[in-house]
Every structure is written in structure tokens, then in C-alpha cells.
Amino acid sequence: MLAFIRFLFAGLLLVISHAFAATVQDEHGTFTLEKTPQRIVVLELSFADALAAVDVIPIGIADDNDAKRILPEVRAHLKPWQSVGTRAQPSLEAIAALKPDLIIADSSRHAGVYIALQQIAPVLLLKSRNETYAENLQSAAIIGEMVGKKREMQARLEQHKERMAQWASQLPKGTRVAFGTSREQQFNLHTQETWTGSVLASLGLNVPAAMAGASMPSIGLEQLLAVNPAWLLVAHYREESIVKRWQQDPLWQMLTAAQKQQVASVDSNTWARMRGIFAAERIAADTVKIFHHQPLTVVK
């Protein structure tokens, strides 16, 4: 009798395992998991955002060795995790030590270590660094399916769609807006082919198109004048920022945004590093506040 019970139990486990089997198309091809992963390591911030959206907790995150790189809204859904280094160069040793049963990697950043990662655990390869808003939502849906939360993710995406529509209704449709990141010697315009640019476009705003095939071109003040947005939103990566120097240039006052005092600084982590459901909602909320001349929430 005991042997029979053990046989039935083993069969039940097999049925449960196959009940959770999922197959998707990732950036490498067909990807299948036979059971729901329990020990997940993510190598991009957007993947942590997606897991948080369905309350799945990763054991490891490539957080650039700084937990505050993760948005507070995302952290609220997670428990303390192990950092596995930077997104650009995650530590294979740290990842292996966690004994993951799923690694979610970025097809742009991690193609070079894909085979090495596969020696540790199954690797779901998705876009993150160079994705658009629509592609990010598709990736979130894939992640939801692979962690056994397909229905929950679909519900969260519907909620997200409704929230974004509410924020969009509070913005003047068709307003020309430009967002860019500013360093000491460089300003990068995020066009509608980038994640942030496409989030703003989804809100009904008029975002610059790609320039000469470049989705995130480095431009000068004269080129910015040619774009001439009604609103200019800037994420300053450095304290010494080229845009701050431009503001002392006589040409600056020729910008419509400058003339109307519609130049705003935004959090670089939220607007440029993070991508995902929570991140898009924060950007939408920030944009409404900016357009209505309200102070932004300080990110901690």
C-alpha cells in the first residue's frame, strides 16, 4: 500500500509539473520551462519591474550594486535580494552561487555571456535596453506566463492601460515634447523609437522621430532648436551637465520651451534607467504634474 501511495504521489507531482509547462518565443527562439521557477535572477531593472507587477520575488538582481536603482514602487513588492553586480557586467559567480532555476537576461547587454549563463540555469532572453514601450509590455506578458502568473499579468496590464489613459486625458493632446539625458559633454534626445519617448507618445504627446536612423541621437543646441519643443524634459546624469551650460548661451532663449518657462528636470533613474509597468506609470504621473506646474515627488 505504501509503495502504491508513493507511486500516486510521484504521478501527481508529474502532472502538476506539466500543468505549469510554458513555451514562448524569446529573442533567441523557442523557450520552454517544464515547471514554475522558484529561484529567479534578473539582469535588468525592467525585469524586476515585471516580476513586481505580479508579486513574484527574484532572489537576485543586477542592480548596479545600488538597491535604490529599483523604483520605490517596485521595491514595495519585493523582499531583500542579492545583488549580482552591474547590468553591464553581472557576476557569473554571484549568479551561480544563488542556484537559480531561471535567469532573465537582456538580448542587448548579455548576448556575449548567454552561453555562460546557460551553464548555470535556463535563460529567458528578452529586449530591455533598446526596447520600446510596446515591446516592454510584450516582455512583461511573456515573463508573467513563464512564472505561472499569466492571468495575473493580463489583469495588471489591463489596469495599467486604464491608468495610462487617465493620465493621458489630463494632458493637452499633440503637444510637442522632447525628453533627453544630459551629461557633461553630451545630450541624447530620446525619440519615439526609445522606451521613454514611446511612453510619452502613448500619452498623446508629439515626440520627435528618429534622426538619420538613430533612436537616441546625440545632438547639439542648434539641433535642439530645430526640434523646438513646447516642453523640454531633461534628466541630468551629472551635476555638471551640458544643458546647464546651454542655458547660459544666447541661443537658449530662442527655444519655445525656454521662452515659456517650460523646461523641467526629471529623475534620471526613473526616466532613463528604469523601464517597465511601474516606471511608465511614474513617468505618466510626473508628466501630468509637470504640465500642470506641480512639484514632482522626490524619489528615495
UniProtKB/Swiss-Prot annotation:
The keyword Repeat does not apply. Residues 1-21 form the signal peptide. This is Fe(3+) dicitrate-binding periplasmic protein FecB. PROSITE patterns: FE_B12_PBP. Changing residue 248 to C: Retains 92% of wild-type citrate-mediated Fe(3+) transport. Changing residue 222 to A: Retains 26% of wild-type citrate-mediated Fe(3+) transport. Part of the ABC transporter complex FecBCDE involved in citrate-dependent Fe(3+) uptake. Binds both iron-free and iron-loaded citrate although it binds iron-loaded citrate with a higher affinity. Binds different forms of Fe(3+)-citrate as well as citrate complexed with various representative Fe(3+)-mimics (Ga(3+), Al(3+), Sc(3+) and In(3+)) and a representative divalent metal ion (Mg(2+)). Can also bind various tricarboxylates in iron-free and iron-loaded form.
